[in-house]
Amino acid sequence: CTYAENFLHILGAEKITPLMTRIMDATLVLHGEHTINASTFTAMVTSSTLANASQVVASAIGSLSGPLHGGANEKVIAMLQKIESKEEIRPWLDETLKAKNVVWGMGHREYSVKDPRANILTDMVQELFEEREGGVTDIFEKAIELEKACEEKLSHKGVYPNVDFYSGILYKEMDIPTDIFTPIFAMSRVSGWLAHWIEQIQDNKIFRPTQNYVGSDDRAYICLLYTSPSPRDGQI
Protein backbone atom coordinates (compact mmCIF):
# COMPACT_ATOMS: atom_id res chain seq x y z
CA CYS A 1 0.00 0.00 0.00
CA THR A 2 1.57 3.29 -1.10
CA TYR A 3 1.49 6.57 0.83
CA ALA A 4 -1.10 7.95 -1.63
CA GLU A 5 -3.29 4.84 -1.50
CA ASN A 6 -3.17 4.73 2.29
CA PHE A 7 -4.27 8.37 2.43
CA LEU A 8 -7.28 7.59 0.22
CA HIS A 9 -8.16 4.73 2.59
CA ILE A 10 -7.93 7.10 5.56
CA LEU A 11 -10.35 9.46 3.80
CA GLY A 12 -12.83 6.59 3.55
CA ALA A 13 -12.82 6.03 -0.21
CA GLU A 14 -15.05 3.04 -0.98
CA LYS A 15 -13.34 1.91 -4.17
CA ILE A 16 -9.72 2.85 -4.86
CA THR A 17 -8.50 2.08 -8.36
CA PRO A 18 -4.86 2.07 -9.49
CA LEU A 19 -5.62 5.23 -11.49
CA MET A 20 -6.92 7.05 -8.40
CA THR A 21 -3.76 6.07 -6.53
CA ARG A 22 -1.59 7.28 -9.41
CA ILE A 23 -3.50 10.58 -9.56
CA MET A 24 -3.13 11.19 -5.84
CA ASP A 25 0.56 10.29 -5.99
CA ALA A 26 1.06 12.65 -8.94
CA THR A 27 -0.70 15.57 -7.24
CA LEU A 28 1.45 15.11 -4.14
CA VAL A 29 4.60 15.18 -6.29
CA LEU A 30 3.43 18.17 -8.36
CA HIS A 31 2.69 20.18 -5.21
CA GLY A 32 5.81 19.05 -3.35
CA GLU A 33 8.02 22.02 -4.27
CA HIS A 34 7.70 25.09 -6.45
CA THR A 35 10.32 27.80 -5.90
CA ILE A 36 10.23 30.42 -3.17
CA ASN A 37 6.56 31.08 -2.50
CA ALA A 38 5.28 32.64 0.74
CA SER A 39 5.12 29.47 2.85
CA THR A 40 8.47 28.17 1.59
CA PHE A 41 10.14 31.51 2.29
CA THR A 42 8.59 31.47 5.77
CA ALA A 43 10.03 27.99 6.31
CA MET A 44 13.47 29.20 5.20
CA VAL A 45 13.40 32.20 7.55
CA THR A 46 12.34 30.00 10.47
CA SER A 47 15.02 27.46 9.54
CA SER A 48 17.66 30.18 9.69
CA THR A 49 16.93 30.67 13.41
CA LEU A 50 17.87 26.97 13.90
CA ALA A 51 14.32 26.10 14.89
CA ASN A 52 13.51 22.39 14.75
CA ALA A 53 11.67 20.68 11.89
CA SER A 54 8.24 20.76 13.56
CA GLN A 55 8.50 24.49 14.21
CA VAL A 56 9.59 25.11 10.62
CA VAL A 57 6.54 23.25 9.30
CA ALA A 58 4.23 25.02 11.77
CA SER A 59 5.43 28.44 10.63
CA ALA A 60 4.98 27.50 6.97
CA ILE A 61 1.44 26.30 7.64
CA GLY A 62 0.73 29.62 9.34
CA SER A 63 1.75 31.41 6.14
CA LEU A 64 -0.30 28.99 4.05
CA SER A 65 -3.43 29.84 6.05
CA GLY A 66 -3.65 33.29 4.45
CA PRO A 67 -6.25 33.63 1.64
CA LEU A 68 -3.69 34.92 -0.87
CA HIS A 69 -1.60 31.75 -0.71
CA GLY A 70 -3.61 28.62 0.11
CA GLY A 71 -7.09 27.48 -0.83
CA ALA A 72 -7.26 28.59 -4.47
CA ASN A 73 -8.47 25.19 -5.72
CA GLU A 74 -11.31 25.31 -3.20
CA LYS A 75 -12.30 28.71 -4.61
CA VAL A 76 -12.15 27.33 -8.17
CA ILE A 77 -14.79 24.73 -7.29
CA ALA A 78 -17.01 27.30 -5.58
CA MET A 79 -16.63 29.64 -8.57
CA LEU A 80 -17.57 26.98 -11.14
CA GLN A 81 -20.53 25.82 -9.06
CA LYS A 82 -21.97 29.34 -9.07
CA ILE A 83 -21.97 29.47 -12.87
CA GLU A 84 -25.20 27.79 -14.00
CA SER A 85 -24.00 26.30 -17.29
CA LYS A 86 -21.15 26.40 -19.79
CA GLU A 87 -23.28 28.73 -21.93
CA GLU A 88 -23.07 31.29 -19.12
CA ILE A 89 -19.26 31.20 -18.99
CA ARG A 90 -18.51 34.06 -21.37
CA PRO A 91 -21.13 36.49 -19.98
CA TRP A 92 -19.92 35.63 -16.48
CA LEU A 93 -16.28 36.22 -17.45
CA ASP A 94 -17.12 39.57 -19.05
CA GLU A 95 -18.88 40.73 -15.88
CA THR A 96 -16.08 39.42 -13.66
CA LEU A 97 -13.35 41.18 -15.63
CA LYS A 98 -15.38 44.37 -15.85
CA ALA A 99 -15.74 44.37 -12.06
CA LYS A 100 -12.00 43.55 -11.75
CA ASN A 101 -12.76 40.48 -9.67
CA VAL A 102 -10.52 37.41 -9.43
CA VAL A 103 -10.88 34.46 -11.80
CA TRP A 104 -9.63 31.75 -9.47
CA GLY A 105 -7.13 29.27 -10.89
CA MET A 106 -5.97 31.64 -13.61
CA GLY A 107 -2.51 33.20 -13.82
CA HIS A 108 0.75 32.61 -12.00
CA ARG A 109 3.58 34.95 -11.07
CA GLU A 110 6.16 32.49 -12.44
CA TYR A 111 4.48 31.70 -15.77
CA SER A 112 3.24 33.60 -18.80
CA VAL A 113 2.07 30.31 -20.35
CA LYS A 114 -0.13 27.52 -19.03
CA ASP A 115 1.33 26.09 -15.84
CA PRO A 116 3.03 22.80 -16.90
CA ARG A 117 1.57 21.14 -13.81
CA ALA A 118 -1.92 22.10 -15.02
CA ASN A 119 -1.28 20.30 -18.33
CA ILE A 120 -0.55 17.07 -16.46
CA LEU A 121 -3.65 17.42 -14.29
CA THR A 122 -5.90 18.16 -17.29
CA ASP A 123 -4.89 14.85 -18.86
CA MET A 124 -5.51 13.04 -15.58
CA VAL A 125 -9.02 14.44 -15.25
CA GLN A 126 -9.81 13.06 -18.70
CA GLU A 127 -8.29 9.68 -17.78
CA LEU A 128 -10.48 9.53 -14.70
CA PHE A 129 -13.63 10.18 -16.73
CA GLU A 130 -12.63 7.55 -19.30
CA GLU A 131 -12.15 4.98 -16.54
CA ARG A 132 -15.63 5.67 -15.18
CA GLU A 133 -17.22 5.53 -18.65
CA GLY A 134 -19.81 8.07 -17.61
CA GLY A 135 -18.73 11.04 -19.69
CA VAL A 136 -17.41 14.31 -18.37
CA THR A 137 -19.20 16.16 -15.60
CA ASP A 138 -20.88 19.54 -15.86
CA ILE A 139 -18.20 21.19 -13.73
CA PHE A 140 -15.40 19.92 -15.98
CA GLU A 141 -17.23 21.15 -19.09
CA LYS A 142 -17.51 24.58 -17.50
CA ALA A 143 -13.81 24.50 -16.61
CA ILE A 144 -12.81 23.69 -20.21
CA GLU A 145 -15.08 26.44 -21.53
CA LEU A 146 -13.68 28.94 -19.02
CA GLU A 147 -10.12 28.05 -20.00
CA LYS A 148 -10.99 28.71 -23.67
CA ALA A 149 -12.70 32.02 -22.86
CA CYS A 150 -9.80 33.18 -20.69
CA GLU A 151 -7.31 32.25 -23.40
CA GLU A 152 -9.23 34.45 -25.84
CA LYS A 153 -9.40 37.42 -23.48
CA LEU A 154 -6.34 37.13 -21.25
CA SER A 155 -3.60 35.25 -23.11
CA HIS A 156 -2.11 38.54 -24.33
CA LYS A 157 -1.42 39.28 -20.66
CA GLY A 158 0.17 35.88 -20.11
CA VAL A 159 -2.76 34.64 -18.01
CA TYR A 160 -3.40 30.89 -18.30
CA PRO A 161 -4.62 28.11 -15.94
CA ASN A 162 -2.37 27.31 -13.00
CA VAL A 163 -2.12 24.09 -10.99
CA ASP A 164 -5.12 25.00 -8.81
CA PHE A 165 -7.54 25.18 -11.73
CA TYR A 166 -7.72 21.42 -12.28
CA SER A 167 -6.43 19.95 -9.00
CA GLY A 168 -9.69 20.81 -7.25
CA ILE A 169 -11.73 19.13 -9.99
CA LEU A 170 -9.63 15.98 -9.64
CA TYR A 171 -10.11 15.89 -5.88
CA LYS A 172 -13.84 16.55 -6.22
CA GLU A 173 -14.26 13.72 -8.73
CA MET A 174 -12.54 11.40 -6.24
CA ASP A 175 -15.09 12.48 -3.60
CA ILE A 176 -12.51 14.28 -1.47
CA PRO A 177 -14.19 16.95 0.71
CA THR A 178 -13.41 20.51 -0.36
CA ASP A 179 -12.16 21.52 3.08
CA ILE A 180 -9.41 18.88 2.78
CA PHE A 181 -7.91 20.43 -0.38
CA THR A 182 -5.54 22.83 1.41
CA PRO A 183 -4.42 20.26 4.01
CA ILE A 184 -3.53 17.97 1.08
CA PHE A 185 -1.42 20.79 -0.36
CA ALA A 186 0.33 21.20 2.99
CA MET A 187 0.82 17.43 3.25
CA SER A 188 2.64 17.40 -0.08
CA ARG A 189 4.55 20.65 0.43
CA VAL A 190 6.05 19.42 3.74
CA SER A 191 8.66 17.59 1.67
CA GLY A 192 9.70 20.86 -0.01
CA TRP A 193 9.67 22.83 3.24
CA LEU A 194 11.89 20.27 4.96
CA ALA A 195 14.24 20.07 1.97
CA HIS A 196 14.79 23.82 2.36
CA TRP A 197 15.24 23.34 6.12
CA ILE A 198 18.01 20.79 5.53
CA GLU A 199 19.65 23.01 2.90
CA GLN A 200 19.46 26.07 5.16
CA ILE A 201 21.02 24.53 8.27
CA GLN A 202 23.88 22.99 6.30
CA ASP A 203 25.23 26.44 5.46
CA ASN A 204 23.23 28.71 7.72
CA LYS A 205 23.11 32.44 8.06
CA ILE A 206 20.14 33.97 9.82
CA PHE A 207 17.82 36.04 7.64
CA ARG A 208 18.09 39.72 8.58
CA PRO A 209 16.90 41.99 5.75
CA THR A 210 17.86 45.66 5.90
CA GLN A 211 15.01 48.13 6.24
CA ASN A 212 15.30 51.77 5.21
CA TYR A 213 13.15 54.11 7.27
CA VAL A 214 11.39 56.77 5.16
CA GLY A 215 9.22 58.47 7.82
CA SER A 216 9.63 61.71 9.78
CA ASP A 217 12.97 62.43 11.46
CA ASP A 218 11.63 63.76 14.77
CA ARG A 219 8.31 62.79 16.30
CA ALA A 220 6.86 63.61 19.70
CA TYR A 221 6.30 60.80 22.17
CA ILE A 222 2.67 60.53 23.31
CA CYS A 223 1.96 58.44 26.38
CA LEU A 224 -0.62 55.76 25.63
CA LEU A 225 -2.22 56.46 29.00
CA TYR A 226 -3.67 59.64 27.52
CA THR A 227 -4.66 58.21 24.13
CA SER A 228 -6.38 54.94 25.04
CA PRO A 229 -9.88 54.76 26.57
CA SER A 230 -9.96 53.49 30.14
CA PRO A 231 -11.76 50.17 30.74
CA ARG A 232 -13.28 51.77 33.83
CA ASP A 233 -15.01 54.33 31.62
CA GLY A 234 -16.86 51.56 29.82
CA GLN A 235 -15.33 52.58 26.48
CA ILE A 236 -13.62 49.36 25.49
What are these regions (language model features)?
Residues C1-Q55, S63, A78-G158:
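Accessory "access/gating" subregions that flank catalytic or transport cores
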Residues T49-I77, V103-S112, Y160-H196:
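Conserved phosphate/anionic-ligand binding catalytic regions in large, soluble enzymes, centered on
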Residues S65-L68, K100-V103, N204-N212:
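Short alpha-helical linear motifs
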Residues A78-K86, E127-E131, I176, A186, ...:
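Short, well-ordered loop/turn and helix-capping segments at boundaries between secondary-structure elements
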Residues R117, K172, I176-P177, R219-I222:
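Short glycine/threonine-rich loop-to-helix capping motif typified by GTGT followed
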Residues I201-L225:
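C-terminal auxiliary extensions adjacent to catalytic cores
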Residues Y226-P231, Q235:
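Conserved small/polar residues in nucleotide/adenosyl-binding loops
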